[in-house]
Design a protein with these regions (language model features):
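Conserved redox-cofactor binding core of oxidoreductases
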Residues: 2-124, 128-130
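Glycine-rich loop(s) and the adjacent beta-strand/alpha-helix scaffold that form part
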Residues: 117, 126-180
Length: 180
């Protein structure tokens, strides 16, 4: 949990090796990119003429060409790489879940919606969720609970679970577990 002083270092410098380790970049291999990882990153298969003219126009206005927006500088204009290879999107599900298909340690619940994280004694122990029919379920973890619900739903789940700004949680009748 960001802001939690548990000794974890979530700085750019600390997490970069993990990003490099997950990446399989077909063009860039340097201090910012990796190869051989699960996430396939490549240049667009085709760059249309309109996009080329746009980049040239912005360069004519004085912006530098940037061949790597995930490199040392994010300033400039250029063509972004994509998380795909040979026209197939390299999603987190494709990269990390597909290899675990059939693994008894993993259970996927499709067409289910997480409602809150179950907290016991200040520790996440599971998830409360509803299936497609609206039936309420709880799943408990044997180890850790990893929340990867995206940029919008992750904070929503945390707040519905009592993790967030205490005043805001109380306004909505949610018991405060952690004031962030």
């Amino acid at each position: 949990l960001r802001g939690n002083n548990d000794g974890a270092d979530w700085s750019w410098k600390a997490v970069l090796p993990h990003f490099r380790g997950m990446e399989d970049n077909n063009r860039l291999l340097n201090d910012y990119h990796g190869s051989g990882g699960q996430m396939q990153v490549s240049d667009p298969g085709h760059i249309d003429q309109m996009s080329r003219w746009f980049v040239q126009s912005v360069q004519a206005l004085g912006e530098p060409f940037n061949p790597d927006f995930n490199g040392a500088s994010q300033r400039g204009v250029g063509f972004y790489q994509f998380m795909n290879r040979h026209g197939r999107r390299s999603s987190a599900a494709y990269a990390f879940l597909s290899p675990l298909e059939g693994d008894p340690r993993l259970t996927l619940r499709l067409e289910a919606r997480a409602e809150r994280i179950l907290i016991e004694n200040g520790r996440a122990v599971g998830v409360q969720w509803r299936d497609k029919a609206g039936t309420l379920h709880q799943s408990h973890a044997r180890g850790e609970v990893i929340v990867t619900a995206g940029a919008l739903i992750t904070p929503k789940l945390l707040m519905l679970s009592g993790i967030g700004p205490a005043d805001h949680l109380r306004e909505h009748g949610i018991a405060v577990v952690a004031d962030l």
